[in-house]
Curated annotation (Swiss-Prot):
NCBIfam families: NuoG (TIGR01973). It comes from the Bacteria. This is NADH-quinone oxidoreductase subunit G. [4Fe-4S] cluster 3 binds at C228, C231, C235, C263. Residues 221-277 form the 4Fe-4S Mo/W bis-MGD-type domain.
Length: 910
């Protein structure tokens, strides 16, 4: 630590930071534009000027750019001297020369870094009286609105998009005072993290188009700290609501997970929560297919009779639902009748992953820690599509070699320009094993494209090269053996090695192979090894801990009359099982019950159905890919806006039914009650109570406010329904209040922050004030709690199996392919996401296409699982012959297709 004197006061600052970052970490305010914690320093905007003095006797000093100045012990600077203040005010005035006077109509207003910095520099009068240069705006897709006339030329957008996220279709054009940031031509931004431009840009050049359609100022929305439900990463998000609709999702800072960035699916994939056509009241279908709407009491009475009428009711849980909901279902039907809803293949994969997390000492890194590895192997996962934020972390890991080299030459890590140039030449090592092309191939040292079986064989060869005690690999051809040896040598010479695998290809063998490589590295005891498993949904691991049998076993029990009825909780059977088998089951539906917040095919076909609430309308806990339990919180009460609705979180419905059956008082009054019960019954959940404060938590006797203190129009929220203002809803489950009344400032006790605001800091840059140091941990520490402990003893138990060589057959073998938009279940109901879902197609190899005389977009037909398919084809250079890729997870493409065999496919002439 260095001692720095600022305006006559001494501060201890980190010598690894630049002066701007160090001052901000110390709570001092220096205006800035081009600098950003994840982008480093460029010195382009000249806004962060301060005066530096040679000694205490120096009265003149010199202006320096604090973002480009290292922290050196004994440095004397002034932020508030007249020279610095006047210079910074003049810079703002120059930057505003061509900026329009449109704050009242600008969507960034009240959430704008430019506004904050203009106020901070006390600039309030413009001397420029001439014409402003104007630009034409571009169409950038359905997510982002472009308003180029607001640009101040800070270069943040291209530095993030091109240098950080590796996007290629956004650049800077022009020169001098006439530069343009955009695409070569109109078109959708191609990068999966393009939405972060909205928060990276300090002005209103890039704004949220989904928010524009129903716009509210930041201070007029109600917020809650949420967890993204779209993949297994568990990114922290801030969810904003107004008039009973989710209006916006922003990144919520978490040092160990998403940091400052989230993917586009997490940011824009929320409109399914606002659907008007959603279940709102309990329904009962009659034999004549009539639908009767029930009130609350009738619904509970019928549900009670349902469980009394049928013996051994199977309860099907859901990977997209919270631990609380799944536990409540398990308690109602009993452990022996609890189905986790996963397929046989996924169930075995998740059991293996959980056993590894529970029993092994292999290190499971956080998302942020992934960036620190210098060699990464990805086995079987197309990360850009299945876990985009991890893919972005892998890209940063590849660039970190440049930072290490820069350090050798005395270049600090925050100096962006030279490091960016070095990273073009020197990168860390990345090896990818997949069935077909991925978007990370462009940064990989080598990509191995082959069948799953062949990937497992090659992974086994690498493990053998690391530990010769393993069985010989004579089965592998000489070229692949040489490649395996080369990769093993790179691994041995690395400081930190990461193996990434997962369950998306539904292969237990490939997970075992990845574990074997990690163990063989660990045996060397010369370098650090990490292991990351990507799973299919937000709470796959949480549900896996509760146990239960697969969906195939559940249907088998029904068929064999070992069970008489079934209840689906937030689960669509049509996503997992063929349409033919589902239709057979639903022919007689009076023994089928469903609880959900979407009109899924399962919900529609059930004999009795209860409407639940989605994740924005409820609070609960989920477990992410690293075994971190995280709490998400209710944003608003949907029944506040319409008392006629009968909407409850699933665990409350199940609690009402359970108490009625047992003729007892309701045991789970609030969220704390049910958390306490399952944490007692499952020792692994013992620490989960600390994942978030309980409902009685207060700061200075106050609950935490969900709304900013400037929130307006509360008395008019329901005036169109009733002019009499009702009292605000009471939240018995959490420490938050449904209003602006309550605590909202940085505090050592609060890590679940609904929204980022601090006096003078209205934009997302306000997160600076909630951190111990800029870009590092929150004042209160990271939220969430790790459920698994790592053992210190070295693991030496390998998985022994004989991977089969893929033999070309006369049948076609079905494999999955994924797209970021369209494979996750709930976002397929989102209107804005539907516009961005690629058309469905069949993926086959170019070799097979040539053999069959097929070209791109030729229409083919085939039959699988008693279902006919008719789709255009796409040709892959790398896909193994006789493999057929299908968009698993899309409507009409159930998970049960994976691994099935197709006898033949034929072209349909149009």
């Amino acid at each position: 630590m260095a001692k720095i004197y600022v305006d006559g006061k001494a501060y201890c600052m980190s010598e690894s930071d630049n002066l701007l970052q160090a001052c901000l970490s110390s709570g001092l305010n220096i205006p800035y534009f081009c600098w950003h914690p994840i982008l480093g320093s460029l010195g382009a905007c000249r806004q962060c000027a301060v005066t530096q003095y040679n000694s205490s006797l120096d009265n003149q000093g010199k202006l320096i750019m604090s973002c480009m100045t290292p922290v050196i012990d004994g440095t004397i600077i002034s932020i508030n001297d007249d020279t610095s203040k006047k210079f910074r005010s003049n810079i703002v005035e120059l930057l505003l020369t061509n900026h329009p006077h449109d704050c009242p109509v600008c969507e960034e207003g009240g959430n704008c870094h430019l506004q904050d910095m203009t106020v901070m520099t006390t600039h309030n009068f413009r001397n420029y009286r001439f014409s402003k240069r104007t630009h034409k705006n571009q169409y950038l897709g359905s997510f982002i609105k472009h308003e180029m006339n607001r640009c101040i030329g800070c270069y943040r957008c291209v530095r993030y998009y091109r240098d950080y996220a590796d996007g290629t279709d956004l650049d800077v054009y022009g020169a001098n005072n006439n530069i343009y940031f955009g695409r070569i031509e109109h078109g959708v931004l191609e990068n999966e993290h393009s939405g972060n431009l909205i928060e990276i840009c300090p002005t209103g050049v890039f704004t949220d188009k989904t928010h524009s359609k129903k716009y509210n100022r930041k201070w007029d929305m109600q917020y809650a700290p949420g967890i993204c439900q779209n993949c297994s990463i568990g990114c922290n998000i801030s969810i904003g609501e107004r008039y009973g609709e989710i209006r916006r999702i922003e990144n919520r800072y978490h040092e160990s997970i998403n940091h400052y960035l989230i993917c586009d699916l997490g940011r824009f994939g929320y409109s399914h929560t606002n659907l008007k056509n959603r279940p709102k009241k309990p329904i009962l279908s009659t034999k004549e297919n009539d639908v009767n709407i029930l009130n609350f009491n009738k619904a509970i009475e019928y549900a009670t009779n349902f469980f009394q009428r049928y013996k051994n009711v199977i309860g099907v849980g859901s990977i997209r639902s919270s631990i609380e909901n799944n536990f409540a279902l398990q308690e109602l039907v009993g452990k022996e009748n609890f189905c986790n809803g996963m397929s046989d293949k996924e169930n075995s994969c998740i059991k293996l992953i959980l056993d590894t997390l529970k029993n092994n000492q292999l290190y499971i890194p956080s998302l942020k820690e992934i960036e620190s590895y210098d060699t990464i192997l990805i086995l079987g996962e197309d990360l850009t599509q299945t876990a985009p934020r991890i893919a972005l972390a892998v890209r940063q890991a590849m660039k970190n070699k440049a930072k290490d080299l820069a350090e050798l030459y005395g270049i600090p890590k925050w100096n962006a320009a030279p490091i960016s140039q070095i990273s073009e030449i020197y990168k860390n090592y990345l090896y990818i094993f997949n069935t077909h092309e991925t978007k990370l191939d462009n940064i990989a040292d080598w990509s191995y494209f082959s069948s799953i079986d062949n990937q497992v064989r090659f992974a086994r060869a690498i493990a053998y090269e690391l530990d010769k005690n393993l069985p010989d690999i004579s089965f592998l051809d000489s070229n692949l053996r040489k490649k395996a040896s080369l990769i093993a040598k790179k691994i041995i010479s690395s400081k930190k090695v990461l193996i990434i695998s997962g369950s998306h290809v539904y292969s237990k063998s490939i997970i075992q192979a990845s574990i074997n490589i990690a163990i063989s590295i660990n045996q060397k005891n010369i370098n650090h090894v990490g292991l990351t498993f990507v799973t299919s949904s937000s709470n796959t691991l949480g549900l896996g801990i509760l146990g239960g049998f697969s969906i195939e076993n559940a249907l088998k029990k029904l068929k064999n009359r070992e069970a008489e009825a079934i209840i689906f909780m937030e689960y669509d059977l049509y996503r997992y099982i063929s349409k033919h088998d589902c239709d057979v089951l639903f022919k007689k539906n009076d023994n089928i019950m469903s609880i959900d917040h979407q009109y899924t095919q399962t919900y529609k076909n059930s004999g009795f159905a209860l409407p639940s609430v989605n994740f924005t309308e409820s609070s609960g806990t989920i477990v992410n890919f690293e075994g971190r339990a995280q709490r998400f919180f209710q944003v608003y009460d949907p029944m506040f806006y319409d008392k006629k609705n009968c909407l409850y979180v699933s665990w409350k419905w199940l609690s009402f039914i359970k108490s009625k059956i047992e003729k007892k008082e309701i045991s789970w009054i609030n969220l704390d009650n049910i958390i306490s019960e399952y944490s007692d019954k499952y020792p692994i959940f013992k620490k989960i109570k600390t994942a978030g404060p309980n409902a009685s938590f207060r700061v200075h006797g106050q609950k935490i406010a969900r709304s900013p203190h400037r929130s307006s129009g509360r008395t008019a929220l329901r005036a169109n329904i009733n002019i009499h203002e009702p009292s605000q809803p009471k939240d018995a489950d959490t420490m938050f209040s449904f209003s602006m009344e309550g605590y909202s400032q940085p505090n050592k006790s609060i890590s679940h922050i609904p929204f980022a605001w601090f006096p003078g800091w209205n934009s997302p840059q306000a997160w600076n004030k909630f951190q111990k140091e800029i870009g590092r941990q929150l004042i209160s520490g990271d939220s969430g709690v790790h459920l698994f402990k790592s053992n210190k003893k070295i693991l030496d138990i390998y998985f022994h199996f004989s991977p089969k060589k893929f033999i070309k057959e006369k049948y076609w073998y079905v494999i999955p392919y994924y797209h970021i938009f369209g494979n996750e279940e709930l976002t397929q109901y989102s209107s804005i996401i539907k516009q961005n879902i690629p058309l469905e197609y069949v993926l086959i190899s170019e070799l097979d296409g040539l053999e069959l005389g097929l070209k791109k977009n030729s229409i083919v037909e085939f039959n699988c699982l008693n279902q006919d398919f008719r789709l255009p084809i796409r040709l892959s250079k790398h896909l193994t012959s006789k493999h057929i890729g299908l968009p698993i997870g899309r409507k009409g493409f159930p998970i049960s297709l994976i691994g099935e065999k197709v006898k033949s496919l034929w072209e349909v002439m149009s």
